[in-house]
């Protein structure tokens, strides 16, 4: 971080935003722009007031990047922009496209624990050999192979999308865990010893979820 750093990309724990906790609390007094998901922004609206600009993150990544580029060009040393994202923003998060677009030295990154970490803590499993995939992007599917996997999903249909992808590639699924609303009041973990068809999957899946599974070689898996 340098004196020119005016944009701060801050990871948030799944429990939510805490305005009184560093590093967020270190920057709020000079904040002019806050970017984040709906549940990240709401706790800060009353704290920061109407003079601060709020921009929600949905599927509008180009808009977010363009707004931060304008903020960096405005070069106001007494003002900050804050970007809030769950976990580590540079790990399957909004931080990657922002870091690729912004000038070097114009931003800092403050990671929180990732949802992968939190998932395996709940399961009581080591995860240093786990492969990670994401279904947030529709442009490229994870390159599957046998082993223990964790998947970031795109919502309540995510577990079906993951299982469909794996089964259609001819692999088997064992020891699957569906982890919902990690760190929140509605936290829930459901286990499935074996998944041979998506018909056994529940319909009441919460939108914020992770899927952990062991992918096994199948008789007809695609190479």
Where are these regions (language model features)?
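Short, hinge-like loop/turn segments at secondary-structure boundaries
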Residues: 52-54, 124-128, 193-196
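Class I S-adenosyl-L-methionine
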Residues: 1-108, 117, 139-141
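Short, well-ordered secondary-structure micro-motifs
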Residues: 47, 94-95, 120-121, 143-144, ...
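Short, structured loop/turn "capping" segments at alpha-beta junctions
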Residues: 109, 126-131, 172-176
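Short, glycine-/small-residue-rich phosphate/pyrophosphate-handling segment
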Residues: 115-147, 154-158
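Solvent-exposed alpha-helices and their adjacent loops that cap or buttress functional pockets
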Residues: 1-4, 26-27, 76, 102, ...
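A contiguous loop/helix-start segment that scaffolds small-molecule binding in enzyme catalytic cores
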Residues: 2-9, 22, 80-81, 146-223
């Amino acid at each position: 971080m340098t004196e020119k750093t005016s944009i701060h990309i801050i990871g948030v724990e799944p429990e939510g935003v805490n305005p009184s906790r560093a590093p967020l609390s270190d920057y709020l007094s000079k904040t002019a722009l806050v970017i984040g998901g709906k549940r990240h922004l709401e706790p800060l609206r009353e704290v920061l007031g109407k003079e601060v600009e709020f921009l929600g993150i949905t599927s509008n990544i180009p808009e977010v990047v363009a707004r931060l580029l304008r903020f960096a060009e405005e070069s106001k040393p007494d003002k900050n922009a804050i970007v809030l994202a769950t976990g580590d923003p540079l790990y399957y998060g909004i931080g990657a496209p922002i870091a690729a677009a912004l000038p070097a030295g114009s931003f800092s990154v403050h990671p929180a624990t990732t949802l992968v970490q939190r998932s395996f803590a709940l399961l009581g499993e080591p995860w240093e050999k786990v492969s990670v995939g994401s279904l947030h992007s529709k442009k490229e599917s994870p390159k599957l192979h046998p082993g223990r996997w964790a998947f970031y999903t795109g919502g309540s249909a995510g577990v079906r999308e993951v299982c469909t992808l794996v089964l259609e590639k001819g692999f088997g699924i064992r020891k699957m865990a569906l982890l919902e609303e990690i760190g929140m009041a509605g936290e829930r973990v459901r286990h499935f010893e074996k998944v041979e068809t998506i018909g056994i999957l529940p319909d009441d899946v919460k939108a914020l979820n992770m899927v952990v599974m062991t992918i096994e070689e199948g008789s007809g898996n695609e190479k």
